[in-house]
């Protein structure tokens, strides 16, 4: 199982979207434990080493390594890619 790490910006985003924070944390923990379970919700971003996961109307931008997932940003569907 890989560990999930959150950047300072991602933690700020989690506090801002409090009601969604629980769902985001659970989705990332589930993906870290079994990537195949959420494979249809994860897409590699074009021109970047990052990937994104869909959690309802929110997107989680993260970087994957063999030992950890680093969550970079969390936000609503339209503005998270800016």
Name each model-derived stretch.
Residues 1-5, 11-12, 17-22, 55-59, ...:
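Enriched for short, Lys/Arg-rich terminal
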Residues 22-23, 45:
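Lipid interaction determinants
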Residues 29-54:
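A short, surface-exposed loop/turn module that caps and links secondary-structure elements
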């Amino acid at each position: 199982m890989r560990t999930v790490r959150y950047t300072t910006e991602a933690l700020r985003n989690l506090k801002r979207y409090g009601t969604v924070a629980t769902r985001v944390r659970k989705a990332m923990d589930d993906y870290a434990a079994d990537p195949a379970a959420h494979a249809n919700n994860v897409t590699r971003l074009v021109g970047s080493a990052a990937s994104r996961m869909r959690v309802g109307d929110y997107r989680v931008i993260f970087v994957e390594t063999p030992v950890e997932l680093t969550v970079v940003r969390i936000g609503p569907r339209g503005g998270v890619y800016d």
